[in-house]
A protein has these predicted regions:
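Local beta-strand N-terminus motif with an aromatic residue
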Residues: 115-116
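A conserved beta-strand element that flanks and buttresses the S-adenosyl-L-methionine
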Residues: 120
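Short catalytic micro-motifs in class I SAM-dependent methyltransferases
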Residues: 123, 127
Length: 213
Protein backbone atom coordinates (compact mmCIF):
# COMPACT_ATOMS: atom_id res chain seq x y z
CA UNK A 1 0.00 0.00 0.00
CA UNK A 2 1.31 3.42 -0.91
CA UNK A 3 2.09 5.80 1.94
CA UNK A 4 -0.30 8.66 2.55
CA UNK A 5 0.96 11.86 0.89
CA UNK A 6 2.72 14.22 3.26
CA UNK A 7 3.54 11.58 5.87
CA UNK A 8 7.02 10.55 6.95
CA UNK A 9 6.99 7.30 4.92
CA UNK A 10 5.83 9.23 1.85
CA UNK A 11 8.76 11.63 2.13
CA UNK A 12 11.08 8.69 2.83
CA UNK A 13 10.08 7.19 -0.51
CA UNK A 14 10.69 10.45 -2.35
CA UNK A 15 14.21 10.64 -0.95
CA UNK A 16 14.91 7.01 -1.85
CA UNK A 17 13.56 7.52 -5.37
CA UNK A 18 15.57 10.69 -5.93
CA UNK A 19 12.42 12.81 -6.39
CA UNK A 20 13.98 15.77 -4.65
CA UNK A 21 14.00 18.53 -7.24
CA UNK A 22 14.17 21.14 -4.48
CA UNK A 23 17.63 19.90 -3.48
CA UNK A 24 20.49 22.32 -4.15
CA UNK A 25 23.27 20.45 -2.37
CA UNK A 26 24.06 23.62 -0.39
CA UNK A 27 22.32 26.22 1.78
CA UNK A 28 19.81 28.39 -0.06
CA UNK A 29 21.84 31.26 -1.59
CA UNK A 30 19.48 34.05 -0.40
CA UNK A 31 19.70 32.83 3.20
CA UNK A 32 23.46 32.35 3.07
CA UNK A 33 23.96 35.80 1.55
CA UNK A 34 21.62 37.48 4.05
CA UNK A 35 23.28 35.89 7.08
CA UNK A 36 26.76 36.77 5.81
CA UNK A 37 26.23 40.34 4.65
CA UNK A 38 23.10 41.99 6.04
CA UNK A 39 23.55 43.98 9.27
CA UNK A 40 19.93 43.19 10.17
CA UNK A 41 20.61 39.45 10.25
CA UNK A 42 20.18 37.72 13.64
CA UNK A 43 23.41 37.02 15.50
CA UNK A 44 24.41 34.19 17.84
CA UNK A 45 24.12 32.95 20.47
CA UNK A 46 20.68 31.38 20.43
CA UNK A 47 18.82 28.13 19.97
CA UNK A 48 17.46 27.84 16.44
CA UNK A 49 14.96 25.39 14.96
CA UNK A 50 14.96 24.44 11.28
CA UNK A 51 11.68 22.56 10.64
CA UNK A 52 11.54 20.29 7.61
CA UNK A 53 15.32 20.48 7.45
CA UNK A 54 15.76 17.77 4.80
CA UNK A 55 19.46 17.11 4.23
CA UNK A 56 20.29 19.84 6.70
CA UNK A 57 22.31 22.31 4.66
CA UNK A 58 20.83 25.33 6.46
CA UNK A 59 21.27 23.55 9.81
CA UNK A 60 24.99 23.12 9.17
CA UNK A 61 25.32 26.73 8.00
CA UNK A 62 23.67 28.10 11.14
CA UNK A 63 25.86 25.91 13.37
CA UNK A 64 28.92 27.27 11.58
CA UNK A 65 27.61 30.78 12.32
CA UNK A 66 27.67 29.97 16.03
CA UNK A 67 24.05 29.09 16.77
CA UNK A 68 22.86 25.96 18.58
CA UNK A 69 20.63 24.40 15.93
CA UNK A 70 17.94 21.71 15.92
CA UNK A 71 17.24 20.17 12.52
CA UNK A 72 13.77 18.61 12.60
CA UNK A 73 12.09 16.46 9.96
CA UNK A 74 9.33 13.85 9.73
CA UNK A 75 11.42 11.80 7.29
CA UNK A 76 13.90 9.34 8.77
CA UNK A 77 15.47 9.03 5.33
CA UNK A 78 16.04 12.80 5.15
CA UNK A 79 17.76 12.77 8.53
CA UNK A 80 19.88 9.79 7.52
CA UNK A 81 21.05 11.85 4.55
CA UNK A 82 21.60 14.87 6.82
CA UNK A 83 23.85 12.85 9.10
CA UNK A 84 25.74 11.52 6.12
CA UNK A 85 26.30 15.05 4.81
CA UNK A 86 26.94 16.89 8.07
CA UNK A 87 27.70 14.39 10.83
CA UNK A 88 25.75 12.82 13.66
CA UNK A 89 25.58 15.98 15.72
CA UNK A 90 27.57 18.06 18.15
CA UNK A 91 27.07 20.52 20.97
CA UNK A 92 25.74 22.98 18.36
CA UNK A 93 23.90 20.60 16.04
CA UNK A 94 21.06 18.18 16.80
CA UNK A 95 18.87 16.07 14.51
CA UNK A 96 15.29 15.32 15.62
CA UNK A 97 12.74 13.00 13.99
CA UNK A 98 9.36 14.59 14.76
CA UNK A 99 6.43 16.48 13.27
CA UNK A 100 6.47 20.19 14.06
CA UNK A 101 2.65 20.06 14.03
CA UNK A 102 2.65 17.52 16.89
CA UNK A 103 3.24 19.46 20.14
CA UNK A 104 3.66 16.30 22.23
CA UNK A 105 6.35 14.97 19.89
CA UNK A 106 8.10 18.34 19.95
CA UNK A 107 7.96 18.47 23.74
CA UNK A 108 9.39 14.95 23.98
CA UNK A 109 12.26 16.10 21.75
CA UNK A 110 13.01 19.04 24.05
CA UNK A 111 11.14 21.62 22.00
CA UNK A 112 8.87 23.18 24.59
CA UNK A 113 6.79 26.29 23.96
CA UNK A 114 8.95 29.44 23.88
CA UNK A 115 12.15 27.35 23.84
CA UNK A 116 13.65 28.76 20.62
CA UNK A 117 15.16 32.16 20.02
CA UNK A 118 14.73 31.73 16.28
CA UNK A 119 13.25 29.58 13.52
CA UNK A 120 14.64 29.34 10.00
CA UNK A 121 12.08 28.34 7.37
CA UNK A 122 13.10 27.26 3.89
CA UNK A 123 11.24 24.35 2.32
CA UNK A 124 8.86 23.22 5.06
CA UNK A 125 6.07 25.72 4.43
CA UNK A 126 5.87 24.90 0.72
CA UNK A 127 5.96 21.15 1.44
CA UNK A 128 2.90 20.98 3.66
CA UNK A 129 -0.63 21.11 2.30
CA UNK A 130 -2.10 24.65 2.26
CA UNK A 131 -4.87 23.51 4.60
CA UNK A 132 -2.24 23.06 7.33
CA UNK A 133 -0.47 26.38 6.89
CA UNK A 134 -2.18 28.34 9.63
CA UNK A 135 -1.55 25.48 12.06
CA UNK A 136 2.10 25.44 10.99
CA UNK A 137 2.58 29.17 11.51
CA UNK A 138 0.85 28.94 14.90
CA UNK A 139 3.13 26.05 15.92
CA UNK A 140 6.23 27.95 14.87
CA UNK A 141 5.13 31.08 16.72
CA UNK A 142 4.44 29.12 19.91
CA UNK A 143 7.96 27.63 19.85
CA UNK A 144 9.49 31.11 19.70
CA UNK A 145 10.38 33.07 22.79
CA UNK A 146 8.67 36.47 23.07
CA UNK A 147 10.72 38.70 20.81
CA UNK A 148 12.09 35.67 18.98
CA UNK A 149 12.48 35.74 15.22
CA UNK A 150 11.44 33.82 12.14
CA UNK A 151 13.78 34.03 9.16
CA UNK A 152 12.02 32.59 6.13
CA UNK A 153 12.60 32.03 2.45
CA UNK A 154 9.23 31.34 0.83
CA UNK A 155 8.41 30.05 -2.66
CA UNK A 156 5.70 32.18 -4.24
CA UNK A 157 4.19 30.79 -7.44
CA UNK A 158 0.74 30.33 -8.93
CA UNK A 159 1.10 26.87 -10.44
CA UNK A 160 -1.44 24.27 -9.33
CA UNK A 161 -0.72 21.21 -7.27
CA UNK A 162 2.33 20.46 -5.20
CA UNK A 163 4.47 20.03 -3.31
CA UNK A 164 6.02 22.50 -3.58
CA UNK A 165 2.80 24.44 -3.02
CA UNK A 166 2.79 28.09 -3.99
CA UNK A 167 1.62 31.11 -2.06
CA UNK A 168 0.79 34.76 -2.54
CA UNK A 169 3.20 37.08 -0.68
CA UNK A 170 0.46 39.48 0.43
CA UNK A 171 -1.73 36.67 1.76
CA UNK A 172 1.26 35.06 3.46
CA UNK A 173 2.20 38.35 5.13
CA UNK A 174 -1.33 38.64 6.51
CA UNK A 175 -1.21 35.06 7.81
CA UNK A 176 2.13 35.71 9.53
CA UNK A 177 0.69 38.77 11.26
CA UNK A 178 -2.38 36.76 12.30
CA UNK A 179 -0.06 34.15 13.84
CA UNK A 180 1.47 36.81 16.09
CA UNK A 181 4.52 37.91 14.09
CA UNK A 182 5.57 41.43 13.13
CA UNK A 183 7.53 42.10 9.93
CA UNK A 184 11.01 43.59 10.02
CA UNK A 185 11.91 42.54 6.47
CA UNK A 186 9.57 41.31 3.72
CA UNK A 187 10.95 41.59 0.21
CA UNK A 188 11.78 39.65 -2.96
CA UNK A 189 14.87 37.57 -2.29
CA UNK A 190 18.20 38.39 -3.85
CA UNK A 191 20.43 35.61 -5.25
CA UNK A 192 17.38 33.38 -5.73
CA UNK A 193 17.78 29.81 -6.95
CA UNK A 194 14.14 29.61 -7.97
CA UNK A 195 13.26 27.64 -11.07
CA UNK A 196 14.35 24.32 -9.56
CA UNK A 197 12.03 21.37 -9.89
CA UNK A 198 11.09 22.63 -13.36
CA UNK A 199 9.16 25.65 -12.08
CA UNK A 200 9.99 28.67 -14.19
CA UNK A 201 7.40 31.15 -12.86
CA UNK A 202 8.40 31.44 -9.26
CA UNK A 203 9.56 34.19 -6.96
CA UNK A 204 11.25 33.70 -3.63
CA UNK A 205 10.49 36.13 -0.83
CA UNK A 206 12.77 36.69 2.14
CA UNK A 207 11.28 37.68 5.46
CA UNK A 208 12.48 38.42 8.98
CA UNK A 209 9.57 38.42 11.40
CA UNK A 210 9.52 38.97 15.15
CA UNK A 211 7.20 37.37 17.69
CA UNK A 212 5.19 39.96 19.55
CA UNK A 213 5.98 40.17 23.30
Amino acid sequence: MRPKPGTGPWWDQRYRDGRDGWELGEPAPPLRHFLATDPRAPQPPGRILVPGCGRGHEVALLAQCGFAVVGLDISAEALREARRCHGNGSDRLQWVLADVLDPEACLAAGLAPASCSGVVEHTCFCAIHPSLRQAYLKAVCELLQPGGWLLGLFWCHDQPDGPPYGCDPDRLAADLVAAGLEPEIWQPAEHSACGRDGRQRCDEWLGLWRRQP
